[in-house]
Design a protein with these regions (language model features):
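Class I SAM-dependent transferase core
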Residues: 1-36
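Mobile active-site "lid"/loop adjacent to the S-adenosyl-L-methionine
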Residues: 115-144
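Conserved Class I SAM-dependent methyltransferase catalytic core
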Residues: 22, 139-196
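SAM/dcSAM-binding transferase cores
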Residues: 195-240
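Conserved SAM/SAH cofactor-binding pocket of Class I
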Residues: 31-124
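Residue-level signal for inorganic ion chemistry
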Residues: 29, 114, 145, 203
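Conserved beta-strand segments of alpha/beta enzyme cores
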Residues: 13, 63, 88-90, 181-184
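Short loop/edge segments at beta-strand edges and connector loops
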Residues: 16, 93-94, 163, 186
Length: 240
């Protein structure tokens, strides 16, 4: 396996490969989650650990459990951690449907997940197994994600996920089925002329119904990346 180290800051690196890589959606989700330094966090299906590592760019959470069922993904995260200066990231190789021995049940402030976007057998599936797992609900579904989050979160704890707009009803139904009430929703488009290609949603465990729809996020401008997207990418960079 060929690895490439992607630089987030002078002190934080992500180990990426063709099997476990990352895109813009990871940065959007990390920013949308509004994590705090005192938070106890878990990132489900962490892959190369991009979301926990992004969270290290400014005041990091107290602890972040980075969970993935694939040993190759956890190995890449460990390689990234070896090259970086980080605090509180705990790599965990486990099935989110079963969690792991000693999992902090009912203790977490925040769970994040950038899940597989496609239902199993929907659309063209990649030949590489790791890519299938990342794109299709082969090893877990959005319902499995919400069930795991419900077990991990304390009362009032938050679940933040992203997905394709066509899966919005599935995500809301799964959240509500596990006592996680959708509270914030934001759609993401390339520009004002195009339909959204992504949504970001936050749910709170045990909360009462009321959802705020936030202004749409546009990621492109005439000159390239939009100002807001650039701020999201730049958040936490060391000042010289």
């Amino acid at each position: 396996m060929e690895y490439k180290y992607e630089k987030l800051t002078d002190k934080i690196y992500v180990c990426a490969s063709s099997d476990h890589r990352f895109g813009t959606d990871a940065f959007l989700l990390a920013d949308f989650s509004q994590y705090r330094a005192k938070d106890k966090v878990c990132d489900l299906g962490t892959g190369c650990g991009i979301i926990p590592l992004i969270m290290q760019k400014k005041l990091p959470p107290q602890v972040t459990y980075a969970v993935d069922i694939q040993e190759g993904a956890i190995e890449q995260l460990r390689l990234g951690l070896e090259k970086s200066e980080t605090a509180g990231i705990v790599p965990v190789c486990a099935d989110l449907k079963e969690l792991w021995e000693g999992a902090p049940l009912g203790q977490l402030d925040l769970v994040t997940c950038n899940p597989p976007y496609k239902v199993n057998n929907a659309g063209f599936q990649s030949v590489i197994t790791a890519q299938k797992i990342a794109r299709h609900e082969i090893l877990c579904t959005i319902d499995d994600v919400c069930a795991a989050a419900q077990k991990l979160l304390k009362f009032g704890g938050r679940l933040c996920v992203c997905n394709r707009p066509e899966r919005l009803s599935d995500v809301i139904f799964a959240m509500k089925s596990h006592d996680i009430e959708p509270k914030r929703l934001r759609f993401v488009s390339k520009n004002a002329e195009e339909a959204p290609w992504l949504f970001l949603i936050e749910g709170k465990k045990g909360s009462k119904p009321f959802m705020k729809v936030e202004p749409q996020l546009y990621i492109r401008s005439e000159n390239g990346s939009s100002e807001e997207l650039q701020k999201i990418y730049d958040t936490g960079k060391e000042q010289v």
